[in-house]
Amino acid sequence: MSSKEQKTPDEQVLDQKEAAKGQQADAAPETADVADPRDERIAELEAQLSELQQRERDNMLRVRAEADNVRRRAEMDIEKAHKFAVEKFASEMLPVIDNLERALDTADKANESLAAMIEGVELTLKSLLDAVHKFGIEVVGDVGVPFNPEVHQAMTMLPSADHQPNHVMMVMQKGYTLNGRLLRPAMVAVSKAQD
């Protein structure tokens, strides 16, 4: 080797740096084209995580909605229990009311010696009706109203010139409702058009 061909140590270092830069430049396009398998795995895991988070949000919303529904149903059941707690008792009181009304209907009002007793039965019936009314019990069975199969039970149909067709013309037994729920239908005679 000649002195011209021999390089100084500084030149050798510079040549090595340039060669390294060239190799890096050649290697860089290769790494850019080849995807790192770790990046693919990270993207896959992020997608799974996002899907699981969405499922958990949906489940949480469903559970919350179900809890609200259970709470609402429980409140409605409690309200119904309070509202209709006296239903059995009220049903047992209806024959007592009927008997007091029958006693008044059959009493001899012309007999002066029975006047005090009749007045006492009337006051007792009035007190009883006031008491049951406070608990939501209402009487069904007025004469002259249109026949309603939801609250009336037709016992007979009679021709009548005094009443419109399909109207209650006589009440045989009063009916009762408890807070809008039918306890007992009114037994009635219904008018029909004369032939």
From Swiss-Prot:
<comment type="similarity">
    <text>Belongs to the GrpE family.</text>
</comment>
<comment type="subunit">
    <text>Homodimer.</text>
</comment>
<dbReference type="Pfam" id="PF01025">
    <property type="entry name" value="GrpE"/>
</dbReference>
<dbReference type="GO" id="GO:0042803">
    <property type="term" value="F:protein homodimerization activity"/>
</dbReference>
<dbReference type="GO" id="GO:0006457">
    <property type="term" value="P:protein folding"/>
</dbReference>
<feature type="region of interest" description="Disordered">
    <location>
        <begin position="1"/>
        <end position="40"/>
    </location>
</feature>
<protein>
    <recommendedName>
        <fullName>Protein GrpE</fullName>
    </recommendedName>
</protein>
<comment type="function">
    <text>Participates actively in the response to hyperosmotic and heat shock by preventing the aggregation of stress-denatured proteins, in association with DnaK and GrpE. It is the nucleotide exchange factor for DnaK and may function as a thermosensor. Unfolded proteins bind initially to DnaJ; upon interaction with the DnaJ-bound protein, DnaK hydrolyzes its bound ATP, resulting in the formation of a stable complex. GrpE releases ADP from DnaK; ATP binding to DnaK triggers the release of the substrate protein, thus completing the reaction cycle.</text>
</comment>
<dbReference type="GO" id="GO:0051082">
    <property type="term" value="F:unfolded protein binding"/>
</dbReference>
<dbReference type="GO" id="GO:0005829">
    <property type="term" value="C:cytosol"/>
</dbReference>
<dbReference type="GO" id="GO:0000774">
    <property type="term" value="F:adenyl-nucleotide exchange factor activity"/>
</dbReference>
<dbReference type="InterPro" id="IPR009012">
    <property type="entry name" value="GrpE_head"/>
</dbReference>
<keyword id="KW-0963">Cytoplasm</keyword>
<keyword id="KW-0143">Chaperone</keyword>
<keyword id="KW-0346">Stress response</keyword>
<dbReference type="GO" id="GO:0051087">
    <property type="term" value="F:protein-folding chaperone binding"/>
</dbReference>
<feature type="compositionally biased region" description="Basic and acidic residues">
    <location>
        <begin position="1"/>
        <end position="20"/>
    </location>
</feature>
<dbReference type="InterPro" id="IPR013805">
    <property type="entry name" value="GrpE_coiled_coil"/>
</dbReference>
<dbReference type="InterPro" id="IPR000740">
    <property type="entry name" value="GrpE"/>
</dbReference>
